[in-house]
């Protein structure tokens, strides 16, 4: 009986030795030392790099294709770098020679033609004026001039028509008018609201484009 018990104990010892992994698998080389939390400290260069990691506004571009009920049509492209002014390049054809009011209107709604684009874009609730005036609508962009062939080309640089932010012009509409804009100085009853620029010949909604 004792021989049987001794043999069973020996077999159990052998089974444990065969199945138990070596202690070294559970022990890191530094397990003899107590573990403390690890804290990474950046040097002066790393701290400066972290401060310099600021997300900047990239260059933005947009376009509006002008269409109307007449033969007037055109393309307006807009470019803005970071928070700088917006550059607007205009080319319109089919106009009568001379000056034509050119404005940015409040809405990008053309369901009823250019009439449904609403009034001039005017987030500051001011009266109509010239682009260089302190008191003006943000959408007051003055006049474009058509040559003898009815083609008007212009470049406008303006700080009040950004492509991002709360006053973004994306989704609003450019409108080219029948008459000259009097820039709020004509003394007409409409001078301080529309510049007495007459009917709306063509319009187009501003949309962002790939760079």
From Swiss-Prot:
It is an enzyme of class 1 (oxidoreductase). Its main location: plastid. It is found in: Plastid, Chloroplast. Keywords: Antioxidant, Chloroplast, Copper, Disulfide bond, Metal-binding, Oxidoreductase, Plastid, Transit peptide, Zinc. Its EC number is 1.15.1.1. The keyword Nucleotide-binding does not apply. Cu cation binds at residues 103, 105, 120, 177. GO terms for biological process: removal of superoxide radicals. Pfam families: Sod_Cu. Disulfide bonds join 114-203. Its cofactor is Cu cation; Zn(2+). Binds 1 copper ion per subunit. Binds 1 zinc ion per subunit. Residues 1-57 form a transit peptide. Destroys radicals which are normally produced within the cells and which are toxic to biological systems. Homotetramer. Belongs to the Cu-Zn superoxide dismutase family. This is Superoxide dismutase [Cu-Zn], chloroplastic.
